[in-house]
Structures are given as structure tokens and as C-alpha cells.
């Protein structure tokens, strides 16, 4: 269960989610209001409506401040300079030029990969960077077969789109 303070801004405009892979903004989505009385649904479960869009400069700056704070904390606690594979920062405008931080998702984040044309490719690239970066650090190097795109590299690992797991 997550408990958040009620904000009229959420009912009026919804939220903006900024999705990061390996510390780099991948994409942003706008989540439409869901619980406002004007939201009509006949289902008991409300479908979340998300639309990909470019974040405003202020949204980007706010999200980047949050991401940097998380990265700094990880460095201080772990002693390692490492970015999270993924995280999501949800913000809502406060109507005065600032933002409310609504949620930071670090573990089970909804990444809205289907809402953004580049989202899935960016996530696959982030995973490939981790896998091949780790292999290079362990002396394995990077595979040379293929065109260099993510799908070709994943295919070498047996994880490409044409593989079926049993």
C-alpha cells in the first residue's frame, strides 16, 4: 500500500514520470488523472492512461536533481560509483513554478516501455551496457559478431527476439 497526500494538481493535470536507465533520462510520460470524479470508468480496476511526451526543462531539471541525490547516496553508503539500472521519478507541478515529488521507484518501477517508441530499445541498450561492460571488466571483451545493435548482441547471448524459453 502506498499512501500519498491528496493534491488537486494530480486531479487537474495528472503526473509526469521521468524514466532513467543507467543514470540517463530515457523517456517521460504524462499519466492522466484517474481518481477525479470526472474520470469515467465502469470497471472496478482503473486503467492507467499514459502518453509519451518530452519533459519540460523544469521537469527535467527537477528529475535530474532527484536522480543525482539518489546517486550520491548510493556512493556514500556503498562506496561504489554506480548508477541504478533503472529508476522512475514522478513529479506534479505545484501551480507556482515548482514541483511536488510524488514517488521515486527504484525496485519495481513501472517503466512505461510501451508508451514511448524508444523506451524498450533504451532499456535493452542499458542491459546490454551492463552485460558487456561486466564481461569486458572480467576479461571477456565485447562480442564482435553482428551489426553492433542491441538485438544482435542479445542474439549472441541467446536472448534475442527469436528465442523461445521453455
Regions found by a protein language model. Name each.
Residues 8-10, 79-81, 165:
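Short, solvent-exposed secondary-structure boundary motifs
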Residues 24, 57-157:
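ATP-dependent carboxylate activation and anion-phosphoryl transfer catalytic cores
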Residues 160-164:
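Short, intrinsically disordered C-terminal tails of secreted or membrane-associated proteins
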Residues 147, 165-166:
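Serine residues within intrinsically disordered or low-complexity segments
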Residues 1-76, 92-95, 100:
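Phosphate-binding site of ATP-dependent enzymes
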Amino acid at each position: 500500500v502506498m499512501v500519498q497526500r491528496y493534491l488537486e494538481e494530480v486531479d487537474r493535470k495528472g503526473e509526469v514520470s521521468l524514466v532513467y536507465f543507467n543514470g540517463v533520462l530515457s523517456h517521460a510520460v504524462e499519466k492522466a488523472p484517474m481518481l477525479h470524479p470526472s474520470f469515467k470508468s465502469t470497471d472496478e480496476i482503473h486503467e492507467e492512461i499514459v502518453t509519451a511526451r518530452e519533459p519540460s526543462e523544469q521537469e527535467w531539471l527537477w528529475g535530474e536533481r532527484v536522480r543525482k541525490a539518489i546517486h550520491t547516496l548510493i556512493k556514500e553508503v556503498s562506496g561504489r560509483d554506480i548508477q541504478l539500472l533503472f529508476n522512475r521519478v514522478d513529479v506534479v507541478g505545484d501551480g507556482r513554478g515548482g514541483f511536488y515529488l510524488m514517488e521515486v521507484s527504484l525496485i519495481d518501477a513501472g517503466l512505461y516501455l510501451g508508451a514511448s517508441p524508444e523506451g524498450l530499445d533504451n532499456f535493452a541498450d542499458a542491459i546490454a551496457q551492463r552485460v558487456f561492460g561486466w564481461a569486458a571488466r572480467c576479461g571477456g571483451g565485447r562480442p564482435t559478431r553482428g551489426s553492433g545493435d542491441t538485438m544482435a548482441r542479445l542474439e549472441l547471448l541467446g536472448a534475442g527476439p527469436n528465442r523461445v524459453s521453455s
